């Protein structure tokens, strides 16, 4: 292997390792939200284990189901509402959940298809980006 090939390989490997790390802790912009969140199923990590799926549909509807987590025993297991983007924040409002109150979230990339959310009331959590719906 020539020194030019070796230098090129080292550069390529360095980029492959550094690029994902550079993306971590990057705030989602409005365009990134549209591109990477809208039209996808987002899985919210829940404190007692498992994941809570929310579907952000391209038509502005958001819906979710907590049936797999057994939420029907405690609250309405399914709900739907609407989503919108305000600045660089993803906002949503459900029909019943959270008493129908609107809420907005700042999204921060923490890795490949992983994010941290910060709600406008200061609550935080994590989620993963699933497949297209």
Q: What are these model-predicted stretches?
A:
Residues 1-10:
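Bacterial N-terminal signal peptides that target proteins for export
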Residues 2, 20-80, 86-133:
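Lipid interaction determinants
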Residues 9-12, 34:
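Short N-terminal leader segment in a subset of presequences, especially plant chloroplast
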């Amino acid at each position: 292997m020539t020194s030019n090939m070796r230098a090129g390989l080292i550069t390529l490997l360095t980029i492959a390792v550094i690029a994902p790390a550079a993306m971590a802790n990057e705030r989602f912009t409005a365009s990134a939200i549209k591109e990477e969140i809208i039209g996808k199923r987002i899985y919210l990590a829940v404190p007692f284990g498992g994941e809570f799926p929310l579907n952000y549909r391209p038509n502005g509807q958001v819906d979710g189901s907590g049936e797999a987590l057994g939420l029907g025993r405690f609250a309405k297991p399914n709900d739907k509402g609407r989503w919108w983007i305000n600045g660089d924040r993803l906002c949503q409002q459900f029909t019943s959940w959270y008493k129908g109150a609107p809420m907005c979230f700042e999204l921060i990339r923490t890795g490949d298809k992983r994010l941290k959310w910060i709600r406008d009331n200061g609550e935080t959590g994590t989620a993963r980006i699933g497949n297209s719906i």
